[in-house]
Design a protein with these regions (language model features):
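Bacterial N-terminal signal peptides
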Residues: 3-13
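Short hydrophobic alpha-helical membrane-anchoring segments
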Residues: 12-20
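N-terminal leader/targeting pre-sequences
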Residues: 19-206
Length: 206
């Protein structure tokens, strides 16, 4: 599970340590990488490269095997005071054979950054399906964006994970309600928000 420093994370002392790195000097970029592996039988995989320069984060995500012609929400998940992990099927607490976003959250954590194509990138845009990339007709997403990350995220980037969402579970070529409603927003189908892949973020060379 998400390696939370449960007692310490809420204490002033440990929180100060976690955010003491916030004053990162500009001009000294560091490269991070995430290998995205499939969840929920999606077959979706990919790579993410993140270049951090202070709080500026330039991200490239190249994925394949996603549901064609459908939007795919994608985020940095996690907490500065924790180490994110990608869930296994053991996270399926309701035994329906799927890991929904809520079931995965104890492993990878809450939304920290929304990788939208334009506009806001905060957690408030976590379900802005009209601003997330749409996969090509062959199920690829090639995403590039430079944004300003929250200081706590930028300073502790290696504690976080990237998750892409959206799986056509019944294979009809679109997101529908055949698998029920989203656990995040009942106005959306579960297919639109269920995790498709996940990868922990690591500094290049580690």
């Amino acid at each position: 599970m998400l390696t939370l420093l449960l007692a310490a994370a809420m204490s002033v002392g440990i929180a100060s340590v976690a955010f003491a790195q916030v004053g990162l000097p500009a001009g000294f970029p560091q490269v991070f990488h995430a290998q995205l592996t499939p969840l929920n039988g999606s077959g979706a995989s990919g790579t993410a490269t993140l270049v951090r320069n202070g709080t500026q984060l330039t991200t490239t995500i190249n994925s394949s095997g996603l549901t064609p012609n459908q939007p795919h929400a994608q985020h940095i998940h996690g907490m500065a005071q924790a180490i994110s992990e990608c869930p296994s099927l053991a996270a399926d607490t309701n035994a329906d054979g799927l890991i929904n976003t809520t079931e995965g959250a104890p492993f990878y954590g809450p939304i920290a950054v929304s990788f939208t194509t334009f506009g806001d990138t905060s957690p408030a845009s976590g379900l802005a399906v009209d601003r997330f990339p749409v996969a090509s007709s062959v199920g690829t997403v090639n995403y590039f964006r430079s944004l300003i990350a929250p200081p706590g995220v930028a300073a502790n980037l290696g504690n976080f994970a990237i998750v892409q969402h959206g799986v056509d579970l019944n294979g009809n070529g679109e997101y529908d309600f055949s698998a029920g409603v989203s656990d995040l927003d009942p106005s959306l189908p579960q297919e639109a928000t269920i995790p498709a892949n996940c990868g922990v973020i690591n500094p290049v060379g580690h």
